[in-house]
Amino acid sequence: MSRLLKKRFKIINSKNGNIYKIKYFSKINNEIYINNILPKKKKGWIFHLTNTCNLFLIYGKARILLVDKKTNKIKKIKLNINKYCNNVVVPPKKWFALENLSNNSEAIFLNILSGKHSSKESLKKDVYLYKKFVT
């Protein structure tokens, strides 16, 4: 019988909920993350220069906030594992944030990134500073 492999997730600590890197595919250059968001918290703003985020809500109810550059307004896409769509593809060069709508349970997203995450490839702003950085 072959031996079982046991691996640890890389955990990226965040005050509004942790991120768990679960896989990096070197042959196709993709990464997969699990992103949990604590009740009534937001994460973002995030802007990827080249990567696409394929976000799947796998637990809870949440919404994705997207900045529309043309109108300078926030588009809100509600996600609920039981009622609404639970997948949103965020293309490169688009500011977005994640918001947990629950009062008492976390929201969990699976994020399949189209490339390798790098601090040089993405920009981040505090989620509560939207009006200060959108032009």
Regions found by a protein language model. Give the residues of each.
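Non-catalytic, conserved peripheral segments adjacent to functional cores
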Residues: 1-86, 103-135
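Short beta-strand-centered segments at strand-helix junctions
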Residues: 88-93
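Asparagine-centered strand-capping/turn motif at beta-strand->loop junctions
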Residues: 98-101
